[in-house]
Amino acid sequence: MSRRRRVVRRAVATEGCSGNVLLARFVNVVMHQGKKALAEKIVFGALKMAESRLQGESGIAIFNTAVANVMPKMEVRSRRVGGVTYQIPVEVREDRSTSLALRWIVKAARASRKRTNKTYMSCLCHELMEAYNKRGGACKIKEEKYRMAEANKAFSHFRF
């Protein structure tokens, strides 16, 4: 039996995000060195750019679809059995799946920022558009996780 206490989840403040908790979490993931106002400016600017590229779709709808397309359902976890470490495929909880999707989108946008000579806002917009269309760096990370889970399906009987 674990002696640790149950973790109490804090509610995310959604002041500037019009009550959208997912968008507030995304702003927090984009935020660097505590500069939340700058992170909000980047995120909302990227959503506005995406909205102008896709006529008829709101920026929030594009964002929600992009995150839903990147959210993983399976991942692998390491488990040591008899001196051998196995990669065991397990299902991902909803909150972890959302967190991973947000992190992967930001990671892909930062990687493309280093490769290209564009602003971070335009790179984030491009990555959101790619995720909306089920392409891009974040979707590649998701597919890679799925391939690992599929390759190690034989070890799924070693459940946690």
From Swiss-Prot:
The organism of origin for this protein: Anaplasma phagocytophilum (strain HZ)
UniProt-listed GO biological process terms: translation
Assembly mode: Part of the 30S ribosomal subunit. Contacts proteins S9 and S11.
Protein name, UniProt field: Small ribosomal subunit protein uS7
Free-text function comment from the UniProt entry: One of the primary rRNA binding proteins, it binds directly to 16S rRNA where it nucleates assembly of the head domain of the 30S subunit. Is located at the subunit interface close to the decoding center, probably blocks exit of the E-site tRNA.
Pfam family, one: Ribosomal_S7
Signal peptide positions on this chain: none
SUPFAM superfamilies listed in its UniProt record: Ribosomal protein S7
Domain of life where this protein originates: Bacteria
InterPro entries per record: Ribosomal_uS7, Ribosomal_uS7_bac/org-type, Ribosomal_uS7_CS, Ribosomal_uS7_dom, Ribosomal_uS7_dom_sf
HAMAP family documented for this protein: Ribosomal_uS7_B (MF_00480_B)
One Gene Ontology term, aspect cellular component: small ribosomal subunit
Family: Belongs to the universal ribosomal protein uS7 family.
Keywords: Ribonucleoprotein, Ribosomal protein, RNA-binding, rRNA-binding, tRNA-binding
GO terms of molecular function: rRNA binding; structural constituent of ribosome; tRNA binding
